[in-house]
Curated annotation (Swiss-Prot):
Residues 1-7 are cytoplasmic. The lineage of its organism: Bacteria, Pseudomonadati, Pseudomonadota, Betaproteobacteria, Burkholderiales. This is Cytochrome c-type biogenesis protein CcmE. Coiled coil: none annotated. GO terms for biological process: cytochrome complex assembly. Belongs to the CcmE/CycJ family.
Amino acid sequence: MTPRRRRLGLLLAALICVGIATTLVLNAFRSNLVFFFSPSQVAAHEAPVARSFRLGGLVAPGSIRREGDGMTIRFIVTDTARQVLVVYRGLLPDLFREGKGVVARGKLEADGTFVASEVLAKHDENYMPPEAADALKQAEQVNRRMAGTPQGARQ
């Protein structure tokens, strides 16, 4: 084998190794990423079914229901435009309240119910995850347009 062919073979082997390593790294990232979706995005079928993601919004007033076992809680998360039913089995954070911000991590069932494995409540009256704040602003703009209220007008 000539030196030129040997260099070409080594270069080809190195490129194959880099390609395999890149594929493995990207696959690992894809399986560990947890995306954020608002109730409006879930209603628009933008959220994956049976794959973990975060759902954020406000706990709808009057929506918290405890099951007979005392550990299963059902509540509705809203972004003021759409609502998603959430089912969670476990202890809720102390700051979990109706009308307050919440981020739930879990999976969407085929029937549209979000089964949460973790529920996080906002930690003070001013904090809201940026994604949830953006989703609420977008939903508010949609509500204004649907109601015919000018965007700059106050209600």
